UniProtKB/Swiss-Prot annotation:
Family to which the UniProt record says this protein belongs: Belongs to the MurCDEF family.
Annotated source species: Deinococcus geothermalis (strain DSM 11300 / CIP 105573 / AG-3a)
GO biological process: cell division; cell wall organization; peptidoglycan biosynthetic process; regulation of cell shape
Top EC class for this record: ligase
InterPro entries, per database record: Mur-like_cat_sf, Mur_ligase_C, Mur_ligase_C_dom_sf, Mur_ligase_cen, Mur_ligase_N, MurCDEF_pg_biosynth, UDP-N-AcMur_Ala_ligase_MurC
GO molecular function per UniProt: ATP binding; UDP-N-acetylmuramate-L-alanine ligase activity
Protein known as: UDP-N-acetylmuramate--L-alanine ligase
Keyword Cell division: yes
Any one GO CC term of the record: cytoplasm
Metabolic or biological pathway, per its Swiss-Prot or TrEMBL entry: Cell wall biogenesis; peptidoglycan biosynthesis
Catalytic reaction annotation: UDP-N-acetyl-alpha-D-muramate + L-alanine + ATP = UDP-N-acetyl-alpha-D-muramoyl-L-alanine + ADP + phosphate + H(+)
Length: 465
């Protein structure tokens, strides 16, 4: 690694071009971003995954070879093998790599290098990381700071999950991988902390929420400064070991504060103040209070790096969100079709609140995600959905988890019905869901497909895209 900023044209020439990195699981949103960043630095890159996808096809078009399936032969001629900590140590590719003297590195070690290479921003938190990271990069771009970015979603402004630039490196840091705790960055942006990615037998999950929150504290403690959400209870207790501590939010006394909020059906206009000094007016073109906070964080970070507020705010006003985060898919009989990644209770509640802001009848197609997550949070999921006018609950998206006895999607729908919701039903037949919505959708509706599984496919089917 060099001292030049990540992903710059200067740094690309400094990396020996003969190095060959092979990335397992290259079809994942994060690993594919690593592949693109490495390729931009002049490294020879290849990868493999179990199934083809739109992402793997894009990588091939970009000149990055992708093999389907896993095979020890993939490591032949490879210098470095990148694999998630979740990959079993006895996996044939890992065994073959170690036997051949190939360096095996976890993904987080690679991200650590990128964060340490120059000015950097690491975004952590249980919710809002992808949107906040995207907004920071877009705001910095608008302000002329030419950021590089690593995002856990496709950013429409970039047409990719990465951006190559010579300015600060902005990265989404995923707490589902325990390796994040040892990373170091210049500025840590801390959105919130809750109990996701905890328990069960996932190799990289945390045993307890206390352990996870201690890891959050360790991460921000290693940063030169932290910008944390003043509105989220308890975050101030997790940032006590950080160097410079700044916060943002709606709370009185926040260093960066959003005031005079004016919500409408399409988003929210608000005023930004820095320690009492008005910086100007901003707008986020996505509904929901959570998106006001995400945008405020982005404007605060841009200000900290010397960016122009007005041009940053203008860029954010045109921002329409990364893929699967309140993503407008199209229309059906005049109804607005939205797809959203919300899969835990806090995200679901935020998405429902955003839908209510549109002023339309809120109709949700919800797909619970993972048996373990459903087991841990089905009452909260049900309660979070109570604000919708109608909820169709699909079967659980398993994410390759084995079934847990007694854990079923009907736990959510039954609790809602027992709590007095008259518009909820369990709907396992997807074809019937599509037929029903096509027959009943009208211009007064917003239909939101919601979940981290493949429920997004229904939104495309409904909108005929």
């Amino acid at each position: 690694m060099t001292d030049s900023p990540p992903c710059s044209s200067d740094s690309a020439s400094s990396v020996p071009s003969q190095l060959h990195y092979h990335l397992m699981g290259i079809g994942g949103i994060g690993v594919s971003a690593f592949a693109r960043l490495l390729a931009a630095r002049g490294v020879r890159v290849s990868g493999c995954d179990t199934q083809p996808s739109e992402l793997t096809e894009q990588l091939v078009r970009e000149g990055i070879p992708v093999a389907l399936g896993h095979d020890p032969a993939h490591v032949t001629g490879v210098d470095v093998l990148i694999a998630s900590e979740a990959v079993p140590k006895n996996h044939p590719e890992l065994v073959a790599a170690r036997g051949a003297g190939v360096e095996v590195r976890p993904r987080m070690a690679l991200l650590d290098e990128l964060l340490r290479a120059g000015p950097s921003v690491g975004v952590i938190g249980t919710h809002g990381k992808t949107t906040t990271t995207s907004m920071i990069a877009v705001a910095m771009q608008g302000a002329g700071l030419d950021p590089a970015a690593f995002v856990g979603g496709i950013v429409p402004e970039f047409g990719s999950n990465v951006r190559l630039g010579t300015g600060p490196f902005v990265a989404e840091v995923d707490e589902s991988d325990r390796g994040f705790a040892v990373l170091s960055c210049e500025t840590a942006v801390f959105t919130n902390a809750e109990d996701d990615h905890v328990g069960g037998n996932q190799a990289t999950y945390w045993e307890t929420v206390e352990q996870q929150h201690a890891a959050f504290a360790r991460f921000v403690g290693q940063a030169r400064r932290v910008l944390y959400c003043a509105d989220w209870p308890g975050l101030d207790q997790l940032v006590t070991t950080s160097g410079e501590r700044l916060n943002y939010g709606l709370a009185e006394g926040a260093d960066y504060r959003a005031v005079d909020l004016r919500p409408d059906a399409e988003g929210t206009t608000f005023t930004v103040a820095r320690r009492g000094e008005v910086l100007g007016e901003a707008r986020v073109g996505l509904p929901g209070l959570h998106n006001v906070l995400n945008a405020l964080a982005a404007l605060a970070v841009t200000d900290l790096y010397g960016g122009n507020f007005q041009t940053a705010a203008a860029a954010l006003a045109a921002f329409r969100g990364p893929g699967r985060r309140w993503q407008r898919i199209g229309e059906l009989n005049g109804a607005l079709i939205i797809d959203d990644y919300a899969h835990n209770a806090t995200k679901v509640a935020a998405a429902v609140q955003a839908a209510r802001q549109t002023g339309r009848r809120v109709r949700v197609v919800f797909q619970p995600h993972r048996y373990l997550r459903t087991q841990q949070s089905w009452p909260r999921l049900a309660d979070a959905l109570m604000g919708a006018d109608e909820v169709l609950v699909l079967d659980i998206a398993t994410a390759s988890e084995p079934p847990i006895p007694g854990i079923h999607a009907t736990l959510v729908s039954d609790r809602m019905a027992q709590s007095g919701h008259t518009g909820v039903r369990y709907a396992p037949d997807r074809a019937e869901v599509v037929r029903y919505l096509r027959e009943t959708a009208c211009a007064d509706d917003v239909i939101v497909t919601m979940g981290a599984g493949d429920v997004w496919k229904l939104s495309r089917e409904l909108a005929s895209v």
